[in-house]
């Protein structure tokens, strides 16, 4: 995949070349999207809109730390939707990992989560965030046990993941109406990178065959159900709903 690769570390140690080789990235000086290695982290920038800033994965500080410490925990909608109850903490495959936010919330309340991400740039961002998270004194121990990244297309990986998870979680990209600054910024940069999720409807059936208990699909409240398959079961929040479908028991 072609993208502009920029090294701002000043280290001169060739780390960016190693990273590019690992993820199959090819430097393209004219590309509007840039993957930038800074002294702190790896980030994605839209070069023609510098005001948007860089997008990076941070499980240790910022919004994710706040959500972990002060968020709803088991009371969060995504936790309710996957069926967390009492001692039951399902094994989850997040087949549309994105920046890993929902996967992290589930891991922080005790679920084991395998994140699937097919885009090599997004996978590189996730991997960078995980490496920093794993090294953190406060969260590193449980994060290594509970949150993993698999770089693969969900459409193919969902048929051969073992062991089977109890829950498959899907949050396909859907055009956002909200004008919240964060969503707007991220979605603009993200959609410039990966384009629309045109094959998302094809994920529901393999997800239902893989999950032993349920499939959870996050949708904006104005979006039709995935693959136009309606379900009466959903956890509804302000602005979103988590549609719940039966999986395929062992």
Curated annotation (Swiss-Prot):
SUPFAM superfamilies with a match to the protein in the record: S-adenosyl-L-methionine-dependent methyltransferases (SSF53335)
GO cellular component: cytoplasm
Subcellular locations according to the entry: Cytoplasm
Top EC class, one word: transferase
Reactions this protein catalyses: guanosine(1516) in 16S rRNA + S-adenosyl-L-methionine = N(2)-methylguanosine(1516) in 16S rRNA + S-adenosyl-L-homocysteine + H(+)
Residues the entry annotates as binding S-adenosyl-L-methionine: 101-102, 117-118, 153-154, 171
Keyword terms: Cytoplasm, Methyltransferase, rRNA processing, S-adenosyl-L-methionine, Transferase
Molecular function GO labels: rRNA (guanine-N2-)-methyltransferase activity
Ligase is among the record's keywords: no
EC number: 2.1.1.242
Presence of the UniProt keyword Methyltransferase in the record: yes
PANTHER family: RIBOSOMAL RNA SMALL SUBUNIT METHYLTRANSFERASE J
Function: Specifically methylates the guanosine in position 1516 of 16S rRNA.
NCBIfam families from the UniProt entry: PRK10742.1
Family: Belongs to the methyltransferase superfamily. RsmJ family.
HAMAP family noted in UniProt: 16SrRNA_methyltr_J
Record's protein name: Ribosomal RNA small subunit methyltransferase J
UniProt source species: Shigella flexneri
